A protein has these predicted regions:
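Short, hydrophobic/aromatic-rich segments at coil-to-beta transitions
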Residues: 15-22
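Surface-exposed ligand/attachment interfaces on beta-rich extracellular proteins
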Residues: 10-14
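An extracellular/secretory-lumen and virion-surface interaction module
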Residues: 8, 36-39, 44-46
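Short, solvent-exposed loop/hinge segments that bridge or flank secondary-structure elements
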Residues: 24-37
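Charged, amphipathic alpha-helical segments
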Residues: 2-9
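Low-complexity intrinsically disordered segments
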Residues: 46-114
Length: 114
């Protein structure tokens, strides 16, 4: 199982050209290429989840949770503590809160299921 690289690199003022990104929740890794979810993996076992509802879908945005129990849908890229929200291309899917956003190493990208 390859190590994931944190995206907390020094600031870069230009356009982000990286194609791959991994959104990490408590139990699951959501792997994206060019904004499309291409692989989902169980964090505990490292097993790919070929039937996951997020596969082949784009993020619609995120859901922000408030202490009073309120939820707020937010467009754009999710922030730490917000849930990923897949709202188009199938049933609505809301994940557990985001713990980190990372960049997958090349060897892990090569393992993505077809």
């Amino acid at each position: 199982m390859g190590e994931l690289a944190k995206t907390n690199a020094p600031s870069y003022g230009g356009r982000d050209r990286r194609r791959h990104k991994v959104f990490m929740t408590r139990n699951t890794e959501y792997h994206f290429r060019d904004g499309l979810c291409v692989a989902v993996r169980d964090r505990r076992t490292g097993e790919w989840l070929p039937g996951h509802l997020a596969l082949r879908r784009q993020l619609f945005g995120s859901i922000r949770f408030f202490m009073n129990g309120a939820l707020l849908p937010t467009p754009g890229e999710p922030k730490i503590g917000e849930a990923l929200f897949f709202g188009e291309g199938g049933r609505d899917l809301i994940t557990s809160p985001l713990e980190s956003v990372e960049r997958p190493p090349k060897d892990l990208v090569a393992e993505y299921p077809s």
